[in-house]
């Protein structure tokens, strides 16, 4: 995706990172596009400054203006119940696109918030929609990404309804491992950018249960925990 330095304010030479040179392009919209198609996509992507930790990208009720591609960092999606309680629905990692929830009614039904300083590419939806009508590969890629999101939602439902607390956390760590591996990061060593409370909220478990299970996994030698850093020692034991 495109990141452009602001020469007017910095006095530096204009520098651009295009989709063709992006390390996560195979996970994102550019995947399978020709050079000409990539150029057209590149031209509609807007520069986005780094999103700071805790910054809200969009909130419930906002009109759909853009889809957001995550270049680095972690974003959480959540809803707020009538009683004011937060329910986390997803954690988005590099290569993920955020904002598909608004396509049906053209308004977002939930919130998206940065869990750490993150870099995102902003893709204006109306222009993307127009391009998709002209370029079958982009339309197919959008459908593929939306299908993957539906699949993740279905897996989440299964996770919460059929598994024990221990199985839920093991499956969560295994899923994170596979997702970090996709853009080329280590599958065995990674940082938990979300808090124990966030993980518990997502899995329907208490903070105490998350902490206790992480301690149990470490004691068994399955993982090593050092603050927010996780090392998976026996990957096969995390699969349910």
UniProtKB/Swiss-Prot annotation:
PROSITE patterns tied to this protein: CNMP_BINDING_3, HTH_CRP_1, HTH_CRP_2
An example molecular function term from Gene Ontology annotations: DNA binding
Location(s) in or outside the cell: Cytoplasm
Main location: cytoplasm
UniProt record, GO biological process: killing of cells of another organism
GO CC term (a single one): cytosol
Pfam families: cNMP_binding (PF00027), Crp (PF00325)
Segments for region (Essential for the oxygen-regulated activity): 15-28
Protein's UniProt keywords contain Disulfide bond: no
Name under which the protein is recorded: Regulatory protein HlyX
Native source organism of the sequence: Actinobacillus pleuropneumoniae
